[in-house]
């Protein structure tokens, strides 16, 4: 039986651990060739080993996403090698400082915005032409409930995810008349290292695993997925539309 994503090229950021790692493996199992991007070489090599064990294939790209020129070079390399991109999963993110806003220095604020917002903006700029070369370009960006909760002491993270959501929804509107479908995925509380750092008193064994969440991202990357500009909430298993105030 032909794998559902056979011959598809999938770019996944933050692929060395957590949801990105699990999503990269799941996409590869579904037949996609995965272009795995992360800062951590060791994590990428471990991912490559697992993908090969599963019978899949991957290209490893050690890249800090604050290297915005590096993202542009990656786009050029993908164009030269594949001529297209079928799937973009913007997963990489950082939590940033957990402090009152008035106590946060400008540098850590900028660091959070660089990874969570600007890197995704640069991915959109550099990968859109490649996604347009696909017969069914699909983009999924990982967000958080923090975008709307305005939780105390998580200001940089919440603000960055709110900005990401507006960025992604805008792109979805701009590409609505094309074959590209653009959506957001909110995993909610998941058993990741970043979650453990922000909530150290939480029992991780009460949380779902990245592998469980990844199984819901894969269908959003399929040519059969027709929705765009939507928000999939993993915790409630609900696909939501955004509503603007009247």
What is each PLM-predicted segment?
Residues 16-18:
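Conserved glycine-rich cofactor-binding loop
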Residues 30-46:
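Conserved glycine-rich Rossmann-like NAD(P)H-binding loop of the short-chain dehydrogenase/reductase
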Residues 42, 62-73, 106:
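The beta1-alpha1 cofactor-binding region of Rossmann-like NAD(H)/NADP(H)-dependent oxidoreductases
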Residues 99-101, 108-110:
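Substrate-binding pocket helix/loop in short-chain dehydrogenase/reductase
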Residues 124, 160:
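Active-site helix of classical SDR
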């Amino acid at each position: 039986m032909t794998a559902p994503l056979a011959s598809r090229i999938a770019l996944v950021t933050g692929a060395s651990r957590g949801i990105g790692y699990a999503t990269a493996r799941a996409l590869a199992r579904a037949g996609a060739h995965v272009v795995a991007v992360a800062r951590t070489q060791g994590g990428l090599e471990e991912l490559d080993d697992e993908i090969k064990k599963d019978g899949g294939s991957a290209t490893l790209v050690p890249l800090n996403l604050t290297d915005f020129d590096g993202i542009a070079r990656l786009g050029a390399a993908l164009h030269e090698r594949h001529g297209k991109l079928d799937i973009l999963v913007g997963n990489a993110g950082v939590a940033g400082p957990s402090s009152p806003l008035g106590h946060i220095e400008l540098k850590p604020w900028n660091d959070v915005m660089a990874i969570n917002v600007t890197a995704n903006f640069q991915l959109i700029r550099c990968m859109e032409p490649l996604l347009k070369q696909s017969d069914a370009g699909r983009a999924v960006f990982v967000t958080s409930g923090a975008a709307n909760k305005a939780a105390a002491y998580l200001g940089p993270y919440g603000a960055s995810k709110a900005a990401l959501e507006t960025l992604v929804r805008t792109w979805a509107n701009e590409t609505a008349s094309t074959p590209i479908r653009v959506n957001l995925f909110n995993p909610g509380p998941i058993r990741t290292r970043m979650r453990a750092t922000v909530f150290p008193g939480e029992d991780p064994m009460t949380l779902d695993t990245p592998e469980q969440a990844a199984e819901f991202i894969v269908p959003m990357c399929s040519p059969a997925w027709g929705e765009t500009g939507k928000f999939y909430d993993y915790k409630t298993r609900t696909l939501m539309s955004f509503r603007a105030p009247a």
